[in-house]
Amino acid sequence: VALMQAIEIYRAEFKPSEQLAAPYVMAGFNVFAADSDEEADYLRSSSQQSFLNLRRGDPGPLPPPVKDFTETLSAAELQVLDSILSCSTAGRPETVRAGIAEFAERTGADELIVTSHVYDHDKRLRSFEIIAEVGIAKD
């Protein structure tokens, strides 16, 4: 919600300049891509833990993933994660492609800044490979 409000205000209040004739929106998007939806959910649990730790006043390095992490959370914690991770997608290539396309359409962003906060380096590289393979590009 806050992102969409910021984009609306930016576009409404934009004043052309020598550097930029029209509004140009860049939006950050978290992607947790893997070969299966289950693996992607597992990988995403590192970021989920990290965000909750930060909210609890206990910041630190990105923790390792935990199987079925969200099953241990309260309804309030799940609501916090839904809000914080509303600019993200997780899943296999088809799921990620759809999530990126939906976010790009919803925001009308001219450019996406994609990140993949995955604990394991090789899994993070695989996530970025999948992101590159799905190749969402604005026409």
What does each model-identified segment do?
Residues 1, 90, 118, 122:
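Charge-dense, low-complexity intrinsically disordered segments
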Residues 2-108, 136:
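An alpha-helical appendage that flanks or caps ligand/catalytic pockets
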Residues 104-139:
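Generic C-terminus detector
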